Amino acid sequence: MLQVQHENHFFLFNFDENRPNQEHFFESYFWQKQNRIIGSAKGRGTTWFIQSQDLFGVNTALRHYYRGGLWGKINKDRYAFSSLEETRSFAEFNLLNRLYQAGLPVPKPIGAHVEKLAFNHYRADLLSERIENTQDLTALLPNTELTAEQWQQIGKLIRRLHDLQICHTDLNAHNILIRQQNNDTKFWLIDFDKCGEKPGNLWKQENLQRLHRSFLKEVKRMRIQFSEKNWADLLNGYQN
């Protein structure tokens, strides 16, 4: 792990030695100039997909942190600064690294960037592994049913996360990815912004109910194939 400061910019990298141009790794135009941009996705902002297998061992996704909701129309990307460890990018990087090292299927974090601004504010970016050849469940389920075993796999994955006392505060069908290849199915969890460790057990049931509501919402919105039998299978995997 390497932490570097350059003027008002702070960097955290998942490698041990300085690399050429590392302070530019969080600038999309740096990658565009090298013809390494291989795609993008729109959300609150643009997530850029980068061909970086030769540099980091994985292709990557570059994301700038933006605010949502009404407040985001006034202040799109500035956050109050208290400490580096509590910034959005450093916190998500460190959590992903902890989960990745524990063997959970999450994106490998590659780098985090914080730009300190006037009046004790900051902007932030995250560079992490792009999980390729996958779909999120809302893209798959309108046309495909999951088996009971696959729903149980999802339940087991969430249980592994909860057993580490990690609460995914935005656990929903969009943040579960699936890859099906050669009769093998694997699931990933993504988007750990504002997530973290939480003591006790009461919150775990609430977290599961959040996911349940997400599936029910997508039944109406995206017409996904989901039933209470599927949910029972997921819970069976979680409990066993």
From Swiss-Prot:
GO terms for molecular function: ATP binding; kinase activity; phosphotransferase activity, alcohol group as acceptor. It is a peripheral membrane protein. The keyword ATP-binding applies. It is found in: Cell inner membrane. It holds the Pfam family Kdo. The keyword Transmembrane does not apply. Keywords: ATP-binding, Cell inner membrane, Cell membrane, Kinase, Lipopolysaccharide biosynthesis, Membrane, Nucleotide-binding, Transferase. GO terms for biological process: lipopolysaccharide core region biosynthetic process. SUPFAM superfamilies: Protein kinase-like (PK-like). It catalyses: an alpha-Kdo-(2->6)-lipid IVA + ATP = a 4-O-phospho-alpha-Kdo-(2->6)-lipid IVA + ADP + H(+). Its EC number is 2.7.1.166. It is an enzyme of class 2 (transferase). Pathway: Bacterial outer membrane biogenesis; LPS core biosynthesis. The active site is at residue 170. Catalyzes the ATP-dependent phosphorylation of the 3-deoxy-D-manno-octulosonic acid (Kdo) residue in Kdo-lipid IV(A) at the 4-OH position. Belongs to the protein kinase superfamily. KdkA/RfaP family. This is 3-deoxy-D-manno-octulosonic acid kinase. It comes from Mannheimia succiniciproducens (strain KCTC 0769BP / MBEL55E).
